[in-house]
């Protein structure tokens, strides 16, 4: 996972490696993918801060990752590989709000899935607010759970429709980070084939480990 790239990879690439782009793109990601293979790794969640160009805004990035046989994923707040931090344009798309703009949110996610379907990915099922905040929702925890449940099932159906495989054959992951863990504990139901990624609290302490039931997933 390339994180906090603002002060490292972004500035180095912008000033030294991809000056003509003024950001990092396929040339930089080719070096990242090569490094992964040298480290015997094959999975990458790309940089996602709004300072850097979103990975999937540059179609050639996907081709580069595929050439190196690197599977692409995304962070806990990027549903279906869509970088909400820099790709969601409020002036054109409205509010990032699943209660009041469900059609708009689902529309951009559906487009992204279709773009990425020919490549190998692990798709993040998620619904958080912009910039690592909670999604606008009711104060009632049951209502929050119902909203997230609806959103995740809609995302799963998009994957099934675009990729043309049963849901259980499409790699998917869910990270109950911050407020999402409380919603998960409210009784959120996830298909058994969805990988749960347990996060820490940003200070190195795990928030949760799998229960005996979850270990059977």
What residue ranges belong to the model's regions?
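Gly/Pro-rich turn-and-neighbor structural signature
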Residues: 49, 56, 66-67, 93-216
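Feature activates predominantly on carbohydrate-active enzymes
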Residues: 1-99, 117, 174-175, 188-191, ...
